[in-house]
Amino acid sequence: IERVNGAMGWLPPPSEGIPGVVVIGTEAIRRGFDPVCLQQAQRVAAAPGVTDVVLNPDAHAGYGAPIGCVLASPTHIYPGPVGVDMKCSMSLLQLDLPGEALRDQQVRRELIHAIAERTPTGAGKGQRSVRKGRPVGVRLGFKAVTQGITAEVCRSLGVPLEWAARCEDASHTGHDGTRQALERRLDDLLETGRFPEYDGKIEQLGSYGGGNHFGEASVVEVVSDDEARRTARHFGLVDGGIAFMSHCGSRGFGYHLATNQFKTLQHWFAREDLPLPGGEKQLVYAPLGTPQADDYLDDL
């Protein structure tokens, strides 16, 4: 990795016509990258349609492409870099509790108990696993994943509608910009038996699995800086207040969709005798505009 400056490096392309890889991180971080991670980054850069690749400081070897890398591909979809934990993301909820409230042991215990009563955790766990879990169910789950946070879905889940305004993907549409495409796709998967154990998987929405999923209550501290205060106001954060940070994904529901896409595209590559980028079967892709790409976009 060549040095660009104190916080950035450059992994030169192995040959002409292939983009190099931007590496974000101090010199110590850049020295710590696994050789397999760097090889995967260069392999991804040489794949069809890829125009840019960036390695973040936490990048490590993944499914054909490094986990923690960012790639731009305007014409091709790559399931490998996306991964299999769909909607794996962070959310932050500002509570109306002041920070000093948690100094009281009883309040701490009540907060922990309230969270545990409502939040299923662990492999295979779903909404029926906790006493006060939100009953997702088959019909409501279908609407949630094909419509997003509509007024009807919010009412059914007991979620304030105004929360939808702060959600980055409050509404869902398919490859053609319609909800109907999503409904047709999910109906097709169910009717053809390509979504086994759907009922149990849909009930896992709104829960934590194993791995690195977590929920964490913290005290918000806004530093004495105008930009920091503006940012806090934008996100509705209260200095000295308690906020709940959550990291989770779509559990078994999203995992099935993602792994099924891997298998479908790998079968398509084998049937059509298409060359794998770098010989790596995890780097199968779908050119935009093809039925394979449309199905992937609808699934995800």
Predicted feature descriptions by range:
Residues 1-52, 76, 80-81, 86-232, ...:
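Glycine-rich, flexible loop motifs
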Residues 48-56, 60-63:
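N-terminal low-complexity or amphipathic/hydrophobic leaders
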Residues 54-56, 243-247:
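Short glycine-rich or small-residue beta-strand-to-loop segments that form or flank ligand, phosphate
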Residues 58-60, 218-221, 248-250:
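Short, flexible loop/turn elements at secondary-structure junctions
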Residues 59-87:
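Active-site cofactor/substrate anionic-group-binding motifs, chiefly glycine-
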Residues 61-62, 89, 249-254:
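Short acidic, Gly/Ser-rich segments with clustered Asp/Glu that frequently serve as metal-coordination loops
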Residues 71, 234-235:
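Conserved ATP phosphate-binding architecture of protein kinases
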Residues 235-245:
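Glycine-rich, flexible loop segments associated with nucleotide phosphate handling
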